A protein has these predicted regions:
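Conserved HGGG/HGGXW glycine-rich cap/lid loop of the alpha/beta-hydrolase fold
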Residues: 18-67
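Conserved hydrolase catalytic core segment
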Residues: 94-130
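Acidic beta-to-alpha connecting loop that harbors the catalytic carboxylate
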Residues: 148-151, 173-175
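Catalytic histidine-centered segment of alpha/beta-hydrolase-like enzymes
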Residues: 174-183
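Active-site loop/oxyanion-hole signature of alpha/beta-hydrolase fold enzymes
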Residues: 58-99
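Alpha/beta-hydrolase fold catalytic core
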Residues: 1-31, 54-55, 167, 173, ...
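Short beta-strand/loop motif that positions the catalytic acidic residue
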Residues: 139, 145-147
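Conserved alpha/beta-hydrolase "acid-adjacent" motif
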Residues: 151-157
Length: 196
């Protein structure tokens, strides 16, 4: 796992990444991982090396988190998504898959809506309660909703109401911070969905 800095509208964006041993040639679609509020891209330290075997995986510290510069004033989910979009533009991704965990799932949703040609597949893990069901309904890409037994266990099923065609997986055996360790019960099905 490596780290680097990239420019975005808020300043520098600190990014953790894993690249396949072959240097990224003949790999699957790159994956962008967006962390929960109060955490950093390090919350994916168990996922990065596993999924990074066959695709490039990027886990930025969201603007204002960890080692990333933040906005001068509180930013909306749409504004944070636009800042992450700056990173996608600087990397010149033609297509990318996006995984959002808790608050990161809201940002992932906004990226999917704003960039329908670029975002190929969306994984939403532990979806916060939202009154933005109409926004979720605008996601046109294939969606996989993963429900670990965390503080959002009760709210995550509501996302299924807004996304009735989404695949869904309940993981009552896995709790909060499931990607900080090797969570094969989650990573295996995510890998399978992304390969589809």
């Amino acid at each position: 796992v490596r780290r680097g800095y990239f420019e975005c509208r808020f300043g520098q964006l600190h990014v953790h990444n894993a690249i396949p041993p072959g240097g990224g040639f003949e790999e699957g679609t790159a994956l962008l991982c967006l962390h929960p509020a109060g955490l950093t891209g390090r919350s994916f330290k168990g996922l990065l090396p596993q999924l990074g075997r066959d695709r490039s995986v990027y886990a930025p510290d969201l603007p204002g988190s960890g080692e990333s510069d933040g906005p001068a004033t509180r930013a909306s989910v749409v504004e944070i998504a636009a800042g992450i979009g700056d990173f996608l533009d600087s990397m010149r991704f033609r297509q990318i898959d996006v995984l959002g965990y808790q608050q990161g799932s809201l940002i992932a949703s906004e990226l999917a809506i704003a960039r329908p040609q670029q975002v190929r597949r969306v994984v939403l893990v532990g979806v916060p309660p939202t009154t933005e069901g109409d926004r979720l309904r605008q996601i046109g890409q294939p969606v996989f909703i993963v429900r670990p037994k965390d503080e959002l266990w009760d709210s995550t099923p509501r996302a299924r109401e807004f996304l009735p065609r989404a695949r869904a997986l309940d993981l009552p055996q896995l709790g909060a911070n499931l990607f900080e360790t090797s969570a094969d019960a989650a990573i295996g099905p995510i890998r399978e969905f992304l390969a589809g």
